[in-house]
Amino acid sequence: MAQERRPQREDRQSREERDSEFVDKLVAINRVAKVVKGGRRFGFAALVVVGDQKGRVGFGHGKAREVPEAIRKATEAAKRELIFVPLRDGRTLHHDVHGRHGAGKVLLRSAKVGTGIIAGGPMRAVFETLGMHDVVAKSTGSSNPYNMVRATFDALKHQVHPKDIAAQRGIKYATLQARRSASGNASEE
């Protein structure tokens, strides 16, 4: 009943292949200090956003005495906390959505083809790693990168696919799409 153990090299290679599908962006790096009996001990804190550019994205926070180690820890934490966000046509949001964390508030709006990513700082990193191509975002309140990223994730978690909405309402997805296109044409006139 003894199971054969694969060599570690193969485990490492499969892990590297899995990690190669992700794109990571460093959002913020801070120098932090811990006060100890002999004075201050300095370290670094990193905030990293990771995504596969196909609708999965996550963020992580890591602290260490050296910058590369803090970034590595943050990247690993981000890969453990991935969420899936349904995208319309693989490029934008299905509907407008608000998010909030602490004093940071964000408004995310779907956009037409060719609009691009109109967002500042930390939000842009989230959208690029998510694989979103057209979105308009506005942040108000706190401009702290940690709050902005968490508020953006709060908004993205509230993104609902129209198929789920149709199922909740007990109607067919095609009916919902027809209503959506009819209301879209009426607003353009």
UniProtKB/Swiss-Prot annotation:
Record function comment: With S4 and S12 plays an important role in translational accuracy.
Protein name: Small ribosomal subunit protein uS5
The organism of origin for this protein: Rhizobium leguminosarum bv. trifolii (strain WSM2304)
Disulfide-bonded cysteines: none
Family, similarity comment: Belongs to the universal ribosomal protein uS5 family.
NCBIfam families according to UniProt: rpsE_bact
Keywords annotated in UniProt: Ribonucleoprotein, Ribosomal protein, RNA-binding, rRNA-binding
PROSITE patterns (UniProt xref): RIBOSOMAL_S5, S5_DSRBD
Presence of keyword Transcription: no
One GO location term (cellular component): small ribosomal subunit
